[in-house]
């Protein structure tokens, strides 16, 4: 590390008033759809309907940003509008650093966000760089320009609740209720997911503005005045067999321990506060939000200490629920790790959601496949919904999800859809969407992407790769290989990030997006990318010894030299 202590901070702006919104229709701002697509999706990430704090470039997840600062944002936009189809833009932690001649089948944008040499991969070091304007936290889909609002995690949360219901309650959540906290960009999916799974939910959130937004977008049904009111509503609705979501404004570190003291018994307990980032994402008990934000600047070490201590009380309450026989699980925000660091030695006694409920899906390459209509026309999404049902006719669970999504999910920004499908299905759907663009059935191209939370694209020992069968939880070669393969296969843009979901030092992960513009060239790229991308997930799990993945690899004809030798 350099010993030069000179302040390297340059003139840059993190706050700017105004509204960013992606263009709609077929008129291009950039030269072709291959560059128009990343331009629109970048802007869509900052749409007020989508982003948590667009004036600060924050999309979701604490400080997950779409660009490092507004000067960088402007230069990214300028670069994309000028980019040719044989050039590639390089983005380093939200800053456009170079345009290079490549070729038409190469990605138009390559993105690396928040990556630090492992020894220095801590929030403390990252925050120093961030304060100097030398870094940006990209979360997962914030800095990779494929966030679609809370819908992006609704189905994954729904699948988790459904599987938990199958394991613990004979597949029936009617008359049951989920206790959780956090109504930000990710946590905001929980109330709707619980409702769709047939359960009531009590959702604690410390910011009233977030509750207001989730009620406005129909992710939350109603708000309780206080804990007594919330519990009365829960008792009423569960007795009636209704699946109603209830928000309660307060601090989970206060409310969960109080519920334990009262002997309240939820049917399921989890959490999706932004505990991964104690400096920016978790309000210490007894503090106001304004006090928290001000002291995060003036006393960062004290803020982190106070936030972690509150997390410890939160986790101790979750452990008490588990010890009372209530299914309790971590939903991927690293709150167990934070609590363990301040003395809760048994914080990991309750499992993460992936090993508990999701890993069998990952073994078959099934994960959060998503697409967005660049036209801005909801009819384009409804037509693709119908195409999914046509091409996957026998999956009643998937059809039910699509029907519920159309009925209950409000689009945020550009219309989009998510559905969990796997190896074989993704390429089939992508090629069909491309043909729909070619024929004019869709009014403009669509982009296909996914969360970085997928079967082959992440190493996260406290989340996606927790408790791997062979002990390879922390091996991060896999997301690097995924990014390299997607680049070689011709994805339109590819990203490689660090720290998403669980915070600095705890994850590495990659993403890809591909454009369906109706051309033959796009079809060739789609066939490669949408096969190879989920195939890396099957490969990764087969390599770890999972029989489901080994069988899937054989069924799909994957060439895995060390499997079945």
Curated annotation (Swiss-Prot):
Predominant subcellular localization, coarse grouping: cytoplasm
Binding positions (NAD(+)): 61-62, 139, 185-187, 205, 210, 251-252, 272-276, 282-283, 331, 501
Domain of life from the UniProt record: Bacteria
Essential cofactor(s): NAD(+)
The keyword NAD is annotated on this UniProt entry: yes
GO molecular function, one term: urocanate hydratase activity
Enzyme active site: 419
Family in the record: Belongs to the urocanase family.
Record's protein name: Urocanate hydratase
Organism field: Pseudomonas syringae pv. tomato (strain ATCC BAA-871 / DC3000)
Gene symbol of the encoding locus: hutU
